[in-house]
Curated annotation (Swiss-Prot):
GO terms for biological process: copper ion import; NADPH regeneration. This is F420-dependent NADP reductase. Its EC number is 1.5.1.40. Optimum pH is 8.0 for NADP reduction with F420H(2). Optimum pH is 5.5 for F420 reduction with NADPH. Keywords: NADP, Nucleotide-binding, Oxidoreductase. It is an enzyme of class 1 (oxidoreductase). Catalyzes the reversible reduction of NADP(+) by F420H(2). In this reaction the proS hydrogen at C5 of F420 is transferred into the proS position at C4 of NADPH. Pfam families: F420_oxidored (PF03807). It catalyses: reduced coenzyme F420-(gamma-L-Glu)(n) + NADP(+) = oxidized coenzyme F420-(gamma-L-Glu)(n) + NADPH + 2 H(+). PANTHER family: DUDULIN-RELATED, F420-DEPENDENT NADP REDUCTASE. GO terms for molecular function: 8-hydroxy-5-deazaflavin:NADPH oxidoreductase activity; coenzyme F420 binding; cupric reductase (NADH) activity; ferric-chelate reductase (NADPH) activity; NADP binding; oxidoreductase activity, acting on NAD(P)H.
Length: 212
């Protein structure tokens, strides 16, 4: 499967690129600047070895993929989705986006509606799937890291959700869990500021989640 990581130059994009590429998937790292995407793709290839990882501008990456993952900072994500609307409308689009604000008392969820629902509205698409919000990105980007985390997944299109859950399940240590329709995304996204607050107030490192 060809997976585009739009804005895939951060830790979540790096982790997905390395782990999915070593499983045999074709990875396209997207960025607003092609040279940055190509440089990151070359960096990832050096780590992953004989793997298919290329770099392109976001527009070209979106055009080339079967699945697009919005590994973009929240503040730029909606503009990017709007710019790529005509390309992404018919694609499966994964949203790990979380609107988070940091204040004196900690982290808060900063949106009336879920990021995933906003993306779906912008794209006019039912194929948006909400997932990967609670992945500790720096740990995930380290191939030596061993983990056992659950990944809640929300979506309205059952087939798109099944494809994304199947892809996630290929990564050793991740268990996708169906968390219902896209309207539940706000519940899942709000786990991220909760985790960040637990880390902050307890002096803990990056945390994932596991339902027992």
């Amino acid at each position: 499967m060809r997976v585009a990581l739009l804005g895939g130059t951060g830790n979540l994009g790096k982790g997905l690129a390395l782990r999915l590429a070593t499983l045999g998937h074709e990875i396209v790292v997207g960025s607003r600047r092609e040279e940055k995407a190509e440089a990151k793709a070359a960096e990832y290839r050096r780590i992953a070895g004989d793997a298919s990882i290329t770099g392109m501008k976001n527009e070209d990456a979106a055009e080339a993929c079967d699945i697009a993952v919005l590994t973009i900072p929240w503040e730029h994500a909606i503009d990017t989705a709007r710019d790529l609307k005509n390309i992404l409308r018919e694609k499966i689009v994964v949203s790990p986006l979380v609107p988070v604000s940091r204040g004196a008392k900690g982290f808060t969820y900063s949106s009336e509606r879920s990021a995933a629902e906003i993306v779906a509205e912008v794209l006019e698409s039912e194929k948006v799937v909400s997932a990967l919000h609670t992945i500790p990105a720096a740990r995930f980007a380290n191939l030596d890291e061993k983990f056992d985390w659950d990944v809640p997944v929300c979506g309205d299109d059952d087939e798109s959700k099944k494809v994304v859950m199947s892809l996630i399940s290929e990564i050793d240590g991740l268990r996708p869990l169906d968390a219902g329709p896209l309207s539940n995304s706000r519940l899942v996204e709000s786990l991220t500021p909760l985790i960040l607050n637990i880390m902050r107030f307890n002096g803990m490192g990056e945390l994932g989640i596991k339902f027992l």
